[in-house]
UniProtKB/Swiss-Prot annotation:
The gene is trmFO. It is found in: Cytoplasm. This is Methylenetetrahydrofolate--tRNA-(uracil-5-)-methyltransferase TrmFO. It is an enzyme of class 2 (transferase). The keyword NADP applies. One of its GO terms (biological process) is tRNA methylation. Its EC number is 2.1.1.74. One of its GO terms (molecular function) is tRNA (uracil(54)-C5)-methyltransferase activity, 5,10-methylenetetrahydrofolate-dependent. NCBIfam families: gid_trmFO (TIGR00137), PRK05335.1 (NF003739). Gene3D superfamilies: FAD/NAD(P)-binding domain. SUPFAM superfamilies: FAD/NAD(P)-binding domain (SSF51905). It catalyses: uridine(54) in tRNA + (6R)-5,10-methylene-5,6,7,8-tetrahydrofolate + NADH + H(+) = 5-methyluridine(54) in tRNA + (6S)-5,6,7,8-tetrahydrofolate + NAD(+); uridine(54) in tRNA + (6R)-5,10-methylene-5,6,7,8-tetrahydrofolate + NADPH + H(+) = 5-methyluridine(54) in tRNA + (6S)-5,6,7,8-tetrahydrofolate + NADP(+). Coiled coil: none annotated. One of its GO terms (cellular component) is cytosol.
Length: 451
């Protein structure tokens, strides 16, 4: 394809992975990183690919969705996974790393690549083009650049994420839950309802108020939007606030009794197949341990709940990707701009790296005049892509960042008894489907990371 040149803005997990993949594809890369001249409040190290909040890339077990993503990225020659394997520290089946060695190794490999030039500068405006640029500036994108991205996104740029817990459908006690949309609107099975009597509601509110909360980072001022307050903050405003807010029972009579409960927790279908449900309005800063305990102990129908995702609220600059980005992760309004990483609405180190890999691959295809070939839907990479395009979610879904979870995958066919069997089936199907996608254009054999 000749010596094309692209710009990658941001040297985190997504930007580093993308820069490596592009360079391995024969493209000259200018990687623009604001450190060490300027840092976000969360960063300490001078190097690229700094792990901020944890040194863990989570489970390396390929029968978990994130472990399957690890496996796929290794097969694709991921720099991030190669560096993680080389700097691994003991952590059971989790892939945990020595942060400083990991960052130093990624930095060294990128600086040592003949087609990569690292420029240390803070970018304040989006490049005008016509050259291709990948924006991978992360959840703490600087104010000036964020304002430019917001203008591009037409208001579809969010500055905090408000994530409610998601529960596996088959762990909900259906002898307690009932299907009903408020006032009978919509298709009834889009929502499940968990009814409370007054005593159960009072006990639940008390548990929320007493529950242990996550302390905010120094760079996260606890300023909340009124439309997405943490449930415990609403509970602090008055004993009945939740019963008139996200837990209001109006229009949700129990069809088995014909009576209206004192309060309800509504569960909204999270995926098309109905394998997971979101606890509506339950964004929270309770610790994950407390979320599990309180929701299982105090919410009728969730005693045996298995959580696909737990709730959180934190500073996180992210685009409403399904509406702002095309399927190849380029901006619909300015196609020379591509986006990757947490700014697109993926959550987690590995997911960010995977998104960077996908964007780089799309850019290589654009430069070569080829159509972008998305990853197969049943792979972990494909599941993330389905999230970014909105394909994994039902109509009207409130787009929020997510980790890779099996709820994003297309439903399995056939019978699979038990959770372990379903995970095995997902993994085996993904392995078969990823193989022909790894190198469809016969240009990624050189994509393997250097030792």
């Amino acid at each position: 394809m000749g010596r094309e040149r692209v710009t990658v803005v941001g040297g985190g997990l997504a930007g580093s992975e993308a820069a490596w993949r592009l360079a391995q594809g024969g493209v000259e890369v200018e990687l623009v990183e604001m450190k060490p001249g300027r840092r976000s409040p969360a960063h300490v190290l001078d190097g690229l690919a700094e792990l901020v909040c944890s040194n863990s890339l989570r489970s390396d077990n390929p029968h978990n969705a994130v472990g399957l993503l690890h496996e796929e990225l290794r097969r694709l020659g991921s720099l991030v996974l190669s560096a993680a394997d080389a700097t691994r520290v003991p952590a059971g089946d989790a892939l945990a790393v020595d942060r400083e060695r990991f960052s130093a190794l990624v930095t060294g490999r990128l600086r040592g690549h003949p087609l990569v030039r690292v420029r240390q500068e803070e970018l304040l405006r989006l490049p005008e083009g016509p050259g291709l640029t990948l924006v991978a500036t992360g959840p703490l994108t600087g104010d000036a650049l964020a304002a430019d991205v917001a203008a591009l996104a037409g208001g579809r740029l969010h500055f905090y994420d408000a994530i409610a817990p998601i529960v596996a459908a088959d762990s909900i006690d259906m002898s307690i839950a009932y299907a009903r949309s408020r006032y009978g609107k919509g298709s009834g099975d889009d929502y499940l309802n968990l009814p409370f009597d007054e005593g159960q509601y009072r006990a639940f509110v008390g548990a929320l108020l007493a529950g242990e909360k996550v302390a905010a980072h120094d760079f996260e001022e606890p300023r909340y939007f009124e439309g997405c307050l943490p449930i415990e903050v609403m509970a602090e405003r008055g004993a009945d606030v939740l019963a008139y807010g996200p837990m209001k029972p109006v229009g949700l009579e129990d069809p088995r009794t014909g009576r209206r409960p004192f309060a309800v927790v509504q569960l909204r279908r999270e995926d098309v197949a109905g394998t997971a449900y979101n606890l509506v309005g339950f964004q929270t800063r309770l610790t994950w341990t407390e979320q599990r305990r309180i929701l299982r102990e105090y919410v009728p129908g969730l005693a045996g709940a298995e959580f696909v995702r737990l709730g959180q609220i934190h500073r996180n600059t992210f685009l409403e990707a399904p509406r702002v980005l095309a399927p190849d992760l380029s901006a619909r309004e300015r196609p020379h701009l591509f986006f990757a990483g947490q700014i697109t609405g993926v959550e987690g180190y590995v997911e960010s790296a995977a998104c960077g890999h996908l964007a780089a691959r799309a850019m290589l295809d654009r430069l070569a005049g080829r159509p972008f070939l998305p990853p197969p839907a049943a792979t972990a990479l494909g599941a993330l892509h389905r999230h970014l395009t909105g394909e994994a979610h039902p109509p009207g879904y409130d787009y929020q960042p997510t980790n890779v979870v099996f709820a994003l995958f297309p439903p399995l066919t056939g019978r699979h008894r038990g959770k372990a069997a379903r995970k095995d089936a997902h993994a085996e199907r993904a392995r078969k489907e990823i193989a022909p996608w790894i190198d469809p254009w016969t240009h990624t054999a050189r994509g393997a990371a250097a030792p």
